[in-house]
Amino acid sequence: IAVRVDNSEQPNSRWYSGCGIYRNVWLTTVEPLYVDLWGTYVTTPEVSEQKATVSVSTTIKSEMTAEASVKIETIIRDGSQNSVSTQSTTQQFKPGDSNVIEQQLQIDNPVFWSVDNPHLYTVVTNLYADGKQTDSYETPLGVRTFEFDAEKGFFLNGESIKIKGVCMHHDLGALGASINTRALERQLEILREMGVNGIRTAHNPPAPELLQLCDKMGFIVQDETFDMWRKRKTTYDYSLYFNEWHERDLTDHILRDRNHPSIFSWSIGNEVMEQWTQADADTLDIMQANLLLNFTRDIDESEISDTLSVNSLLTIKLVNMVKELDPTRPVTAGNNETRTINHLLLSGALDIIGFNYHLNDYDNVKVEYPGKPFIASETTSALATRGYYRMPSDSAYIWPARWDMTFEDPSFSCSAYDNCHVPWGSTHEDTWRKVKENDYVSGLYIWTGFDYIGEPTPFNFPARSSYFGIIDLAGCLLYVSV
């Protein structure tokens, strides 16, 4: 097998995406009777302190040359690898069959998965053809209940908690974009020590290793698929491939990730241009795209019709695709257009209203989107350089004043007193106060947990990485983290 990777067409992202094959690739060999790729779907339709009903749906494929009697044995093991439930099903399989086997098991006195005690069960699926074992497949399971409530916020296992999350790009600072599980684990350890309990995967499906760590360490994940749909943000970005690939990519994303207990919501897009009716959005350069993303406030509302737009219909389509594959979790999107002219919000399809920034618009949610839970899907965008403090400490710096204004400062540094932020953002203190004091806000995902390579706001070259992180590229904490 030979794979050629070409990343020469630039820019294709608004941050550093990395080059080459930077995640693990697995070549799996199987017997003629096997569990299909991402072939299990494990849910817990009924959960109480006394018992948990576990529904296991398994897709099994046969490439055998003759019909066989197939035994499907499913075992649930607890965190100590003790068997706590088992069930077997027998069915005839013919050559070429692809069958879905449904089973229900019960766990007595289940240990709940939580932020403080992320207990993991393992669902083991064993296949036997005419008495000979042909496959063994493992699926993670976390027993928990959760709810996003429009009035009272987020509940996990009946307990009200605030999601105190951060957004994370996939690079690892000086290590680059290549996956390194221990480096990811170190990042999560630093975040957890700081009090973080949530991760938003900005703005693409994450490495599977990240989700495995979040399962094990107890993080509340918002799993995001797209940064753009049909309308582009950079010259060579995913919009070139959206029409051909979005159905396959979204399907694969949900199938791959839906068994992770750390995932509590899906996001189908981040600040996509389809929020607005902008005919020229396909011809924007990166500076104009950022301007439109963060400062669009002059749309003629008379252009909005009473019927659903193509962009609203596309929103409904994407949400329905997710729901068909995983009806157990809510779907949201990161919206930086908070008014009711937003085509994604007009669709009515989003289960959770997610606002990127616009702190002063939070209180409008209950009026403009009644009955919908709310989360601050992206917040703050404060700027800081470790060890650099500009006096006086109670002064405020908004850098730059607007995206369409040039900005220079010879220090190439931002004050770390939590008194410097971008014009569409806010300080950490102001943001957290708003979230903490309002029960209806389920939580927040701060931009960003760690600094990342690329998008060196507010400076241009020779700056080469962001200033947004609560933690810098080396993993050192800034003033705002303590």
Regions found by a protein language model. Give the residues of each.
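Secreted/periplasmic carbohydrate-active enzymes, especially glycoside hydrolases
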Residues: 1-213, 217-221, 249-265, 322, ...
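Generic beta-strand/beta-sheet core signal
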Residues: 4, 164, 201-202, 224, ...
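Substrate-binding clefts and catalytic carboxylate motifs of secreted carbohydrate-active enzymes
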Residues: 9-11, 17, 27, 32-33, ...
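Active-site-proximal loop/turn and secondary-structure-junction residues that shape catalytic pockets
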Residues: 147, 203-207, 225-227, 271-272, ...
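Alpha-helical scaffolding within the catalytic cores
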Residues: 148-152, 208, 243-255, 336-342, ...
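The substrate-binding groove and active-site-proximal loops of carbohydrate-active enzymes
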Residues: 167-182, 190, 194-202, 227-245, ...
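Conserved protein kinase catalytic core
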Residues: 170-171, 206, 230, 276-277, ...
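Short hydrophobic/aromatic-enriched beta-strand-loop microsegments
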Residues: 218-225, 351-357, 373-379
